[in-house]
Design a protein with these regions (language model features):
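Non-globular, low-confidence helical/coil segments that flank catalytic cores
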Residues: 1-258, 282, 306
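Mature, structured domains enriched in cysteine- and short glycine motifs
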Residues: 237, 243-309
Length: 309
């Protein structure tokens, strides 16, 4: 599951609450942090492992605003969540992408979803939290399709810290999204020895290849970060353990393709993992782009950019 508590100037925001097994822990942890009122309670989506703990919070604390995805789920836990919202005299808000909310010394912006589909994970509410020059993105279980929509939204996706989508599943954390967000650190929230094999090898390989340091709750437990608007201090060092949850996970094997034309020239960025047909694609810095043949780029492990190829 996933649960994030944000505190600033006496105000509290909770993003997801974890599953049933963690609900009492979530409520107890918030009480230990002095929480009595929650200004923003955000449910990324309504899967049990994200929303169950929020039901406990609705029963234990006074809540001022509830934000969630604009769809209905036919489950008992969703019904319990909605009853808890109604008992507070509230309704679930569905703010549009780009909507900003002030919070303590900072603010947060809605990045997704831009539309609602039949994919519950893809409907996840994604937010970017900013405090001074520090920024964090919380993704819920956002899908690769949702990430692509965010990349095309024109919103600023760069962040210092990324909460990795869907517990490190290979269904998200795409190259395109990582290259737009360029986080220095990532947090993977997943249960130890979970039955899904989270995090998946493909995702961890992408994080490692971009030099993104990682925290993992399955290895390190609760992770806390304190931002003063300039620097971020953590309660522990990153574990930088990029191994998959299931050691038998071999990841996606590359497809065999025809040999590339040696005369085709492409561009690569200083830190990216894709090659481009122009030096200023996306967030690339053309002054730092390097030109080489397509054959050499592929031999170096680079993949074609989906935007310009």
């Amino acid at each position: 599951g996933l649960s994030v508590l944000v505190q600033s100037q006496g105000r509290n925001l909770i993003y997801d609450g974890g599953g049933r097994g963690a609900s009492s822990f979530t409520v107890s942890y918030l009480q230990q942090q002095g929480v009595t009122d929650i200004q923003y309670l955000i449910s990324s989506h309504y899967d049990e492992d994200h929303v169950a703990g929020l039901v406990g919070c609705l029963n234990a604390f006074h809540v001022e605003q509830v934000i969630g995805a604009d769809y209905v789920q036919d489950t008992k836990i969703y019904e319990s969540f909605m009853k808890g919202v109604e008992a507070q005299g509230l309704s679930v808000q569905h703010p549009a992408v780009g909507t900003e909310f002030s919070f303590g010394s900072g603010k947060f912006t809605i990045l997704a979803p831009s539309s609602i589909s039949g994919d519950d994970n893809g409907n996840s509410v994604v937010i970017k939290l900013e405090n001074g020059s520090n920024s964090f993105i919380f993704t819920g279980d956002a899908s690769a399709e949702s990430e692509a929509a965010m990349c095309g939204s024109g919103l600023d996706l760069e962040c210092d810290v990324l909460s990795v989508s869907h517990h490190g599943s290979a269904t998200a954390t795409s190259w395109e999204f990582l290259q737009a967000a360029v986080p220095e650190l990532a947090v993977v929230s997943c249960g130890a020895d979970n039955s899904y094999g989270h995090p998946h090898r493909d995702t961890m390989d992408r994080l490692e290849s971009m030099g993104i340091q990682i925290y993992r709750t399955d290895k390190q437990g609760t992770v806390t970060a304190v931002s003063d608007g300039t620097t971020i201090k953590w309660n522990q060092a990153p574990c930088n353990d990029y191994s998959p949850g299931d050691e038998s996970d071999q990841g996606t094997q590359p497809e065999v393709t025809d040999a590339p034309d040696q005369t085709v020239m492409v561009w690569i960025s200083a830190t990216g993992s894709k090659y481009h047909n122009k030096p200023d694609c996306g967030n690339m810095n053309p002054d730092k782009a390097v030109q080489m043949s397509e054959a050499d780029a592929q031999a170096g492990g680079y993949e074609p950019c989906k935007k310009c190829f």
